[in-house]
């Protein structure tokens, strides 16, 4: 489980897609890798990935065809920035919400409005997920825990505050 509070931004240093899925290598930037072990989970843009190899500054993970398709990971490219979060511990304080790392859908940004220091994003709402998207409820976008501020037909609005934008 994760919290949706991003610990670091890394970069994809390798993306090797084959018929069974993909093997990726993520350069972890400022993510503390000192306590990482084989088999640990690291959310990468909100996608729960299992560490199959690692060193002090990177980890490798296998990505299934299902994950490639459902998450849009198939379009990711070498050098792309990704949000990173290690799995939470039972003693961890979390300021986001419980995040499984299992991606349900891809949403499209429909429009962006600036309001003072905040930024409002209107996103498309997949029809099959509409019953589960509630105003003032939590949602995870690219691994970031956010609050749904408004609903309108087949859309929902998120507001990003300056602190989140700065991170």
Describe each PLM feature range:
Residues 1-167:
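Conserved loop->alpha-helix
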């Amino acid at each position: 489980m994760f919290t949706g509070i991003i610990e670091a931004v890394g970069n994809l240093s390798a993306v090797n897609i084959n018929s069974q899925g993909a093997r990726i290598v993520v350069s972890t930037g400022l993510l503390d890798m000192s306590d990482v072990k084989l088999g640990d989970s690291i959310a990468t843009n909100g996608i729960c990935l299992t560490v199959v190899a690692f060193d002090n500054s990177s980890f490798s993970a296998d990505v299934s065809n299902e994950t490639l398709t459902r998450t849009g990971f198939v379009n990711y490219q070498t050098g792309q920035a990704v949000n990173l979060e290690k799995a939470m511990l039972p003693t961890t304080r979390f300021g986001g919400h419980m995040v499984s790392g299992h991606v349900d859908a891809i949403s499209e940004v429909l429009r962006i409005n600036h309001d003072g220091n905040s930024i409002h994003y209107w996103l498309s709402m997949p029809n099959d997920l509409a019953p589960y998207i509630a105003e003032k409820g939590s949602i995870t976008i690219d691994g970031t825990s956010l609050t749904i501020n408004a609903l309108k037909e087949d859309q929902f609005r998120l507001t990003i505050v300056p602190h989140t934008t700065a991170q």
